[in-house]
Amino acid sequence: ERKIPYFYRKLASIETAVIKTIPLVSIYIPAYNCQDSIIRCVESALNQTVTDLEVCICNDGSTDKTLEVLEEHYTDHPRVRFITQENSGIAKASNTAVNMCRGFYIGQLDSDDYLEPDAVALCLREFFSDRNLVCVYTTNRNVNKDGSLIADGYNWPEFSREKLMTEMILHHFRMFTIRAWKITTGFNETIENAVDYDMYLKLSEVGKFKHINKICYNRTLHTENTSIKKLD
């Protein structure tokens, strides 16, 4: 039986589809010392209205109980995969996690943050309406660890590559196509700052970006970073 390529699946079925051998969407999570937030994070991805989705996690050498939490809750989960590597920093952890992904559309989620249930579906609708898009991103809100609101994130209303050349205007939640990501060199593992900014600048050379002016992502603000290379 000839199978239709997964990136041509009909839009009408995305919210009721069950996961296939090759999922339509992969959410990647670079994780570092996030034992208290990783379950909320992963569950927000699994609870998307789009169920044709997997979650790929790279545990970046966490020194707390992050790995134990993942093993306890997700070892046998059919839609979650995780691996552990030596602590190497956010860029390598992100590359490792993206390289685990099997989906055509890739979503970025930090291990201390969480999604609104319709985040993936809204982004997919934009991708499906314009095949030239390589990245779709939404607006986020900033929250405390307990989920209480700090403020809605700054919102640049429309994508502008000229504006992107001067500052990072791409808010979470962000999704991109794996095909476009492979054209870039991925996340630059030789730098420690502005890792996302560097990658999305490269991605903007590949194709079109689209902003959705809706809050779909909860960004936790605190002193720790998602994945930080340990200092000797």
Segments and roles (model prediction):
Residues 1-44:
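N-proximal low-complexity "stem/linker" segments adjacent to membrane-targeting elements
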Residues 85-101:
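Glycine-rich, basic loop-to-helix element that forms the pyrophosphate-binding segment
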